[in-house]
């Protein structure tokens, strides 16, 4: 009787081509039974093994899961059925950090992913102390001095609002999504006491994919992990690098691939 085992690795922040290249190399190295699923930027890498005994199947799966995890690096956020939203929430709860959004649009994108999860209200204010409160919302504006110093710079403007949201909401992290404007691709941004990080995204992404990009910024920042390719870092009020759409920010078609 043949025994089987399955391991699932969850990955976010790499392109489909990058993930596929890693899996093809693993296949060339002797790993069989690989399958790749993708939805809203989240990849599920399935490693399945069959062997004469359960112990042998377990050993084979564990060996390749560990090797693939090392190759994926900080893009690996969980194993099994854990979503990126759950991984980001777990990081916030573990570090006892509070997240806020600068505006209703951003709050809706993040809130739609976090609301179904247990204890999410302990890590995200859902606007109660920020954009959903009329008094607080009036305080979260682009600082006039920033507008005068960086006229037309929507990245600086978003960072300025995020800084104010941090203060108003007494939070640890503030996130913002900005749709495309003249001369600037849409982007996601996170601000904390150390500064700001931002990453351009494709205008073709779904709401869930945008929310995932926001929450991946949160996960990586909370856990002290490396940022994805194309992410810029800067101090609000100071010059920042150009923000361009990286390959990881391009839309990825939902698909299933077997290797």
Roles of regions detected by a PLM:
Residues 6-9, 45-50, 203:
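Short, hydrophobic beta-strand segments
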Residues 1-41, 61:
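Accessory alpha-helical/coil subdomains and C-terminal extensions
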Residues 20-21, 42, 53, 111-117:
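Mixed-charge interfacial surface used for oligomerization/domain docking
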Residues 56-249, 254-259:
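Short alpha-helical segments enriched in small residues
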Residues 5-7, 43-45, 97, 173:
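Structural beta-strand/beta-sheet cores of well-ordered domains, especially the beta-sheet scaffolds
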Residues 11-14, 39, 49, 104, ...:
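Fold-independent oxyanion-binding glycine-rich loops
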Residues 39, 43-61:
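Terminal amphipathic helices with adjacent charged low-complexity linkers/tails
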């Amino acid at each position: 009787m043949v025994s089987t085992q399955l391991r699932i690795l969850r990955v976010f922040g790499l392109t489909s081509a990058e993930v596929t290249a890693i899996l093809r190399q693993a296949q060339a190295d002797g790993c069989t039974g690989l399958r790749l699923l993708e939805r809203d930027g989240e990849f599920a890498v399935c490693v399945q093994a069959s062997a004469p005994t359960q112990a042998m199947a377990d050993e084979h799966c564990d060996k390749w899961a560990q090797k693939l995890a090392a190759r994926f690096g900080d893009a690996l956020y969980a194993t099994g059925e854990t979503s990126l939203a759950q991984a980001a929430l777990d990081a916030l709860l573990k570090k006892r950090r509070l997240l806020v959004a600068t505006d209703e649009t951003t709050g809706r994108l993040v809130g739609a992913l976090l609301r179904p999860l247990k204890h999410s209200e302990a890590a995200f204010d859902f606007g109660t102390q920020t954009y959903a409160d009329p008094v607080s919302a009036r305080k979260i504006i682009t600082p006039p001095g920033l507008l005068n110093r960086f006229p037309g710079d929507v990245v600086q403007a978003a960072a300025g609002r995020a800084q104010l949201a941090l203060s108003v909401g007494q939070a640890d992290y503030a996130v913002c999504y900005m749709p495309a404007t003249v001369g600037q691709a849409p982007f996601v941004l996170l601000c904390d006491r150390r500064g700001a990080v931002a990453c351009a995204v494709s205008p073709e992404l779904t709401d869930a994919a945008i929310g995932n990009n926001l929450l991946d910024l949160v996960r990586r920042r909370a856990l002290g992990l490396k940022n994805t390719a194309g992410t810029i870092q800067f101090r609000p009020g100071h010059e920042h690098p150009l923000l361009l759409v990286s390959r990881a920010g391009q839309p990825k078609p939902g698909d299933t691939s077997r290797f």
